[in-house]
Curated annotation (Swiss-Prot):
GO molecular function: rRNA (guanine-N7-)-methyltransferase activity
Role summary: Specifically methylates the N7 position of a guanine in 16S rRNA.
EC number in record: 2.1.1.-
Pfam families registered for this protein in UniProt: GidB
Native source organism of the sequence: Caldicellulosiruptor saccharolyticus (strain ATCC 43494 / DSM 8903 / Tp8T 6331)
Protein name: Ribosomal RNA small subunit methyltransferase G
Class of the enzyme per the UniProt entry, highest EC level: transferase
Matching InterPro entries: rRNA_ssu_MeTfrase_G, SAM-dependent_MTases_sf
Residues annotated as binding S-adenosyl-L-methionine: 92, 143-144, 162
Record key words, sorted: Cytoplasm, Methyltransferase, rRNA processing, S-adenosyl-L-methionine, Transferase
Family the UniProt entry places it in: Belongs to the methyltransferase superfamily. RNA methyltransferase RsmG family.
GO cellular component: cytosol
Cellular compartments annotated: Cytoplasm
Length: 253
């Protein structure tokens, strides 16, 4: 006879209710399907995390807020004014965040997950197959190399990154990948003004312009975030992105 503890059932129910409230906050369509896929993704990440380091977060509630809710904050930006299919790239995706939660919640987008770590790329491929996601490609390559390839350069409507690199460094990775009219969505902490000021010249050099900063608190939490929207207005000069050592040692300023 199967015996399931009341404590386990109560914990599982609370977890699902938390995710329900997050999905409701973001007005996610087909929420029951989305919820199931997000829970399966979380379970897979936390299981694999026991064997090799994917995330420092091991608590499920914390995962829902800091990985899922944080990722879904991008959804409202991901639409083209002409109604055409959105093509997006997640730079430095790691184990697939924010890209995979975004793809689950907005399956119509065409998405490239980019990371240079082979183990993490292998995991992302496993995750997309496990979840049955289509219209998603994992590219295991340095972001600056991606920006030099004809297939990817100036081909995306949106780029996003949750990496800890400074904004001027991230912009050199992201802006060469964007079409003119495309946007880089940089996920940052609440206090980002100094970093933004330091990146203004770099953004202009790369063909971009700061469109807006949105500050907000993640649902069901006190976690404060910013999304910096940088619009690409001009073609990026061919010399960008530079090689990794140059980008790190002498960031654009």
């Amino acid at each position: 006879m199967l015996v399931v503890s009341f404590k386990f059932l109560k914990g599982a129910k609370a977890k699902m209710e938390l995710l329900d409230r997050v999905l409701e906050f973001y007005s996610i369509k087909n929420s029951s399907v989305v919820k199931e896929l997000l829970l399966r993704f979380m379970k897979l990440v936390l299981e694999k995390n026991k064997h090799f380091n994917l995330t420092a977060i091991e608590n499920e509630d914390e995962f829902v807020i800091k990985h899922i809710a944080d990722s879904l904050s991008l959804i409202r930006f991901l639409q083209n004014s002409d109604g055409k299919l959105v093509r997006a790239v997640d730079i430095g995706s790691g184990f697939g965040v924010p890209g995979i939660p975004v793809k689950i919640a907005k399956p119509s987008i065409s998405l490239v997950l980019n990371d240079s770590n082979k183990k993490k790329c292998n995991f992302m491929n496993e995750a997309k197959d496990h979840l049955g996601l289509s219209g998603i490609e994992v590219v295991c390559q340095r972001a600056e190399e991606l920006g030099k390839e004809v297939e990817f350069r100036e081909s995306f409507d949106f780029a996003f990154a949750r990496a800890v690199d400074k904004l001027n460094v991230l912009c050199e990775y992201a802006l060469p990948l964007l079409k003119i009219g495309g946007a880089f969505l940089a996920q940052k902490g609440f206090e980002c003004e100094d970093e933004l000021e330091s990146a203004k010249n770099a953004i202009a050099m790369l063909g971009g312009e700061i469109e807006k900063i949105e500050k907000f608190t993640l649902p069901e939490s006190d976690e404060k975030r910013s999304i910096i929207v940088i619009r690409k207005l001009r073609q990026t000069p061919i010399e960008f992105p530079r090689k990794t050592k140059q980008i790190i040692k002498k960031p654009l300023s």
